[in-house]
UniProtKB/Swiss-Prot annotation:
InterPro entries named among the record's database cross-references: Phosphoglycerate_kinase (IPR001576), Phosphoglycerate_kinase_CS (IPR015911), Phosphoglycerate_kinase_N (IPR015824), Phosphoglycerate_kinase_sf (IPR036043)
Name of the protein in its database record: Phosphoglycerate kinase
One of the Pfam families matching this protein, by short name: PGK
One example of a Gene Ontology biological process annotation: gluconeogenesis
GO cellular component, one term: cytosol
Binding positions (substrate): D21, F22, N23, R36, H59, L60, G61, R62, R119, R157
UniProt pathway: Carbohydrate degradation; glycolysis; pyruvate from D-glyceraldehyde 3-phosphate: step 2/5
Family: Belongs to the phosphoglycerate kinase family.
Binding site residues for ATP: K208, G296, E327, G354, G355, D356, S357
Length: 398
């Protein structure tokens, strides 16, 4: 990576500003998935071991008005982080002002402070999300000229807490998580060991147009599953019953199929049900066509076998989007089948592009079998599209 990293700067005795991604799910004030906190630990630990004073910034959920602040405080995160680090985490509970500044000024080497949810600043004119220059400048002034961005999950956004701070410090560098994310995803797409197979699922073609276009140029094969299958089917005149379809994307699907030169591999059967919820019948289709009054909710057994064959010998695999409604045991066979086909390839570099695929791998007990699971759905999608991420572009060149 041509950007400075946290290892390139002297941290001892410095107030080091760090953008982490602690946007974790909370239920009644309890964290239900702490993966993002765990993912940030190597960078935080490195800073404090080097004698730096870590000042952490993160958003949590969406905050547009005062009422939205309820249940969006980072207080539970501060407590969880303290337990994981085995030391106190100072939490003033504010995003600016005398109380925050006083707490920062008395920090000692090796201590950690967490600023309150950066999106609290969105209540008054969306200052965080619109990268208000004064806010970025103010937050930058709280440190000693070093900013570490370790929040891959927001690297595709230009906010005050990443791009804004970067613009106002002497050195803006990448943390270990950001560095790893870029290394795995960008290298997989730009300089893959071949054969390189991409697998794209999820419900909407519209979400993945740019990704499909970019990967058709870069990958040896692109396998399509999930709800967007049926938009591709309908574009070819195949009956889809009541399956999900994006009527306004049929021309796009047709154009992608024409452009693909046989690289785009679609399912050859589906698992269909007579309703999305409260169904009374589930069965495998004979071929591609979905029966009248039914809708496809997963890829079928023939498709699993076809995808297994397409993955044989693959050395690089990037997967983004489940093959079906994996949350329901009746429709998770496709996602499980594809995961198992990926991880059994000898010497494969297997990467999950965040979001629902990451949840599927974790929930279905396959997470530890993959080379890398991205922490950022939207950011990884933009990297897969070949886009430049603002949070990354704002870092200091080596």
């Amino acid at each position: 990576m041509a950007k400075l990293t946290v290892k390139d700067v002297d941290l001892k005795g410095k107030k080091v500003l760090v953008r982490v991604d602690f946007n974790v799910p909370l239920k009644d004030g309890v964290i239900t998935n702490d993966n993002r906190i765990t993912a940030a630990l190597p960078t935080i630990k490195y800073i404090i071991e080097q004698g730096g004073r870590a000042i952490l910034f993160s958003h949590l959920g969406r905050v547009k008005e005062e009422a939205d602040k309820a249940g969006k405080s980072l207080a539970p995160v501060a407590a969880d982080l303290a337990a994981k680090l085995g030391q106190d985490v100072v939490f003033p509970g504010v995003t600016r002002g005398a109380e925050l500044e006083a707490a920062i000024n008395v920090l000692e080497d090796g201590q950690v402070l967490l600023v309150e949810n950066t999106r609290y600043e969105d209540v008054d004119g969306x200052k965080e999300s619109k990268n208000d220059p004064e806010l970025g400048k103010y937050w930058a002034s709280l440190g000693d000229g070093i900013f570490v961005n370790d929040a891959f999950g927001t690297a595709h956004r230009a906010h005050a807490s990443n791009v804004g701070i970067s613009a106002n410090v002497e050195k803006a560098v990448a943390g270990f998580l950001l560095e790893n994310e870029i290394a795995y995803i960008q290298e997989a797409v730009e300089t893959p060991e071949r054969p390189f197979v991409a697998i794209l699922g999820g419900s909407k073609v519209s979400d993945k147009i740019g990704v499909i276009e970019n990967l058709l140029e870069k990958a040896d094969k692109v396998l399509i599953g999930g709800g967007m299958t049926y938009t591709f089917y309908k574009a070819q005149g195949i009956e889809i019953g009541n399956s999900l379809v994006e009527e306004d994307k049929l021309d796009v699907a047709k154009a992608l199929l024409e452009k693909a030169n046989g690289k785009l591999i679609l399912p050859v059967d589906s698992k269909e049900a007579n309703a999305f919820a409260g169904y009374t019948e589930v069965r495998d289709t004979e071929g591609e066509a979905v029966s009248e009054g039914f809708l496809g909710l997963d890829i079928g057994p023939k498709s699993i076998a076809k995808f297994d064959e397409a993955l044989t010998g693959a050395k690089t695999v990037v997967w983004n989007g489940p093959m079906g409604v994996f949350e329901n045991p009746d429709f998770q066979a496709g996602t499980i089948g594809v995961m198992d086909a990926i991880v059994k390839q000898p010497g494969v570099k297997s990467i999950i592009g965040g979001g629902d695929s990451a949840a599927a791998a974790i929930n279905l007990g396959r997470a530890d079998k993959f080379s890398w699971i991205s922490t950022g759905g939207g950011a990884s999608m933009e990297l897969l599209e070949g886009k430049v991420l603002p949070g990354l572009a704002a870092l200091t060149e080596k």
